[in-house]
Amino acid sequence: MTVDLLLGLQWGDEGKGKIVDVLTSKYDIIARFQGGPNAGHTLEFDGIKHVLRTIPSGIFHKNNINIIGNGVVIDPVVFKTEVDGLAKFNLDLKSKLIISRKAHLILPTHRLLDAASEASKGKAKIGSTLKGIGPTYMDKTGRNGIRVGDIELVDFKEKYRALANKHEEMIKFYDVSIQYNLAELEKEFFEAIEDLKKLDFIDSEEYLHQAQKAGKSILCEGAQGSLLDVDFGTYPFVTSSNTTAAGACTGLGIAPNKIKEVYGIFKAYTTRVGSGPFPTEDFEDAGTTMAKVGNEFGSVTGRQRRCGWLDLVALKYAVQINGVTQLMMMKGDVLSGFETLKVCTSYKYKGQEIAHLPYNIEPENIEPVYTEFKGWKADLTGMSSYDELPKELKDYIDFIEKEVEVPIKIVSVGPDRKQTITK
């Protein structure tokens, strides 16, 4: 029996989907434990790019089960679109994909609330994806939410109507005007609910407990990144769930002492989407080049990601709070061609040099301190072994390992699953 955990160590978009896809053949079960359709996991193989929003990244492999855990929030309409998009691959979703009854549903009015809330903030907006994630988690913690298991109840539509009416009253409190046709949105929602009912709903904590007893191997898949965690991220510019290792326990019902390996995924540089502090953001040519070469656009929102140098202070913090045992570095190929690379090793903070992430990392409080490295010219995308990598990249990797005190086991040199080097 093995339970391992894979999560992002930055502000999301680290490349988790690709690594889950690469590792999937080792596991019987892939289980998503938090988040919703605000984050997309991108996989690329056989020359085709696939973006999954809610469905676990193991869905393309034949011999495993994919679970959507209780910590996930599901938009039935988005989910239906995702399922429809997989139809051409002739996947047996009925046997491969199961959903926790305790996962919460995103209602159309959750999305409307999200839009009204964000619009009301003006310049103080946090950069919400407007997918209804925040309002859904608010209803969850406020004990008002509707869960997947409620679909099986005879009074499901009554429960829906009561909550939707409440949301409409709440929207009126925002001093903004948003245009919507709720009747159309609800028609689409209930049609999607009928499709959702074609899949099996389970008590996922019991299912996973029995799977562990039977010796099955499980990979817990996180969404977004550790610096977006609602407790440990750059609050309030965060998501609404726990994206850290603890979220796997609460989002699946797996005991902490059952988790063996914690795989931490990070980019060779740093990116962020939307608002919020970003100490190593580069506003000059380097950031522009990273965005262009790395194709740094959100897989769900399409927004261009902000780019900058690797922040080791933030990376160490994420490794610490997650108990990471293995690191996997993504997009090493994007840094090819830079004469000089920079890595932030500490901050100047209120007149002192510190090597930890403080409470407030707004630009007026933080100045990154950099160590510089010689870059490399070689194109990495065709390389298949660690020995082939240029010395300068190996020096870069060695420095990160020594600073973070966790080994880098995988180096990604391209988007395709084949462009993955094991160290």
Curated annotation (Swiss-Prot):
Q: Which domain of life is it from?
A: Bacteria
Q: Quote the pathway field.
A: Purine metabolism; AMP biosynthesis via de novo pathway; AMP from IMP: step 1/2
Q: Which residues bind IMP?
A: 13-16, 38-41, 129, 143, 224, 239, 303
Per UniProt, the cofactor note for this protein states: Binds 1 Mg(2+) ion per subunit.
Q: Where is the active site?
A: 13 (proton acceptor), 41 (proton donor)
Query: Where GTP is bound, by residue?
Result: 12-18, 40-42, 305, 331-333, 412-414
The places in or outside the cell where this protein is found are: Cytoplasm
- Pfam families listed in its UniProt record: Adenylsucc_synt
Listed GO MF terms: adenylosuccinate synthase activity; GTP binding; magnesium ion binding
Indicate whether Aminoacyl-tRNA synthetase appears among the record's keywords.
no
Q: Which residues bind substrate?
A: 299-305
Query: What assembly does the database describe for this protein?
Result: Homodimer.
The family note in this entry says: Belongs to the adenylosuccinate synthetase family.
Name the chain's protein: Adenylosuccinate synthetase
